[in-house]
């Protein structure tokens, strides 16, 4: 089993799809890496030689940010937006959609479970 950037690639899959198991590498990037290293897309992960795995590893380390480094950079970017106090940062702080979606009826994934408002105040008024 090939291990690249701390991720075990599935043996039976073709290498172009196996590389997409690494955070930060999609199909397009996977194909760019394989073109740069001269490895066929059709090759299975199990059929790769140690030299080919080393070439892929080297290409990824030199030209791409993946896994932990990429996750850290994304979270730092979000944190800097929040620290700046810009609109996008405030939306992140409030847990609302950031990219302009409507929130009157949708956005349940981002807002979480519904909170009933009227029933709580009605029960408090009876006492």
UniProtKB/Swiss-Prot annotation:
InterPro entries: Rbsml_uS13_C, Ribosomal_uS13, Ribosomal_uS13-like_H2TH, Ribosomal_uS13_bac-type, Ribosomal_uS13_CS. Residues 101-116 have a biased composition (Basic residues). GO terms for molecular function: rRNA binding; structural constituent of ribosome; tRNA binding. Disulfide bonds: none annotated. Keywords: Ribonucleoprotein, Ribosomal protein, RNA-binding, rRNA-binding, tRNA-binding. It comes from the Bacteria. GO terms for biological process: translation. Residues 100-127 are annotated as: Disordered. GO terms for cellular component: cytosol; small ribosomal subunit. Belongs to the universal ribosomal protein uS13 family. PANTHER family: 30S RIBOSOMAL PROTEIN S13/40S RIBOSOMAL PROTEIN S18 (PTHR10871), SMALL RIBOSOMAL SUBUNIT PROTEIN US13M (PTHR10871:SF1). Located at the top of the head of the 30S subunit, it contacts several helices of the 16S rRNA. In the 70S ribosome it contacts the 23S rRNA (bridge B1a) and protein L5 of the 50S subunit (bridge B1b), connecting the 2 subunits; these bridges are implicated in subunit movement. Contacts the tRNAs in the A and P-sites. Part of the 30S ribosomal subunit. Forms a loose heterodimer with protein S19. Forms two bridges to the 50S subunit in the 70S ribosome. This is Small ribosomal subunit protein uS13. It comes from Campylobacter hominis (strain ATCC BAA-381 / DSM 21671 / CCUG 45161 / LMG 19568 / NCTC 13146 / CH001A). The lineage of its organism: Bacteria, Pseudomonadati, Campylobacterota, Epsilonproteobacteria, Campylobacterales. The gene is rpsM.
